[in-house]
């Protein structure tokens, strides 16, 4: 199970949002780190096939096959949690996931079991019959992760999954990704250093659409040239005046 990006490029008009991006993802948890405008969202939208590469702008391969040719079979392997998604306040958590299961074409009987399973994974089983309008921000975040898990995807893309969570809920997400990362490819986008260094097996630092460097936390901090060897100082080293975008560092 591999996701390979080769020389990927994406322009928005004259803006080069992703520049010659090449990387191979295998089973594990990967953190995409960088300030606003680094290219994280563009990269995720290309991987989820919500955006198309430039003409002659590289290729994205899933298990050796171009995703543009795989179509529905690729999307069936994919779970995506967007940073923002409409939640229906008058629906219960269970009904909301049932609605999304139907849209994904999951048979009703199978969906019932899956919904119970994903709610348990994000520790929302006791709130299954509660209306979403009464959920806290952290509960809504976990519900969005639950919907991404429907269909048991092999590739999971999470956009800012820990944004606005309290420490207890961050632990829930960390434990979940630790377990799922043993059998899935998980990409997590964030600009919060303190979160990603405890969640990710490998971290990719992006700036203005370019992959600056990547590695484990221990590998990355060895690149720090001045001061204490921390991921925060590496961030400052690479981003300088942009570093104030790394809230929570």
Model region roles, listed by residue range:
Residues 214-215:
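ABC ATPase "signature
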Residues 98, 102, 109-127:
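Conserved ABC ATPase "signature" region
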């Amino acid at each position: 199970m591999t996701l390979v990006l080769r020389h990927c490029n994406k322009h928005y008009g004259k803006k080069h949002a992703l520049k010659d991006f090449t990387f191979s993802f295998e089973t594990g948890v990967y953190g995409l780190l960088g300030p606003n405008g680094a290219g994280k969202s563009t990269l995720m939208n290309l991987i989820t096939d919500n955006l198309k590469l430039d003409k002659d702008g590289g290729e994205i391969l899933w298990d050796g096959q171009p995703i543009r040719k795989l179509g529905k079979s690729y999307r069936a392997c994919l779970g995506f949690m967007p940073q923002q998604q409409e939640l229906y306040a008058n629906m219960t958590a269970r009904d909301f996931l049932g609605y999304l299961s139907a849209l994904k074409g999951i048979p009703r009987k199978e969906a019932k079991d899956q919904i119970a399973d994903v709610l348990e994974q994000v520790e929302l089983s006791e709130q299954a019959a509660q209306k979403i309008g009464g959920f806290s921000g952290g509960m809504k975040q976990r519900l969005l992760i639950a919907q991404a898990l429907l269909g048991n995807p092999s590739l999971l893309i999470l956009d800012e999954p820990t944004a606005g969570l309290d420490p207890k809920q961050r632990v829930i997400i960390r434990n979940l990704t630790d377990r799922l990362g043993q059998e899935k490819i998980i990409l997590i986008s964030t600009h919060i250093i303190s979160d990603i260094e405890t969640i990710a097996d490998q971290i990719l630092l992006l700036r203005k659409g370019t992959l600056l460097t990547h590695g484990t936390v221990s590998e990355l901090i060895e690149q720090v040239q001045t001061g204490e060897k921390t991921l925060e100082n590496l961030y400052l080293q690479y981003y300088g005046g942009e570093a104030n975008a790394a809230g929570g560092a």
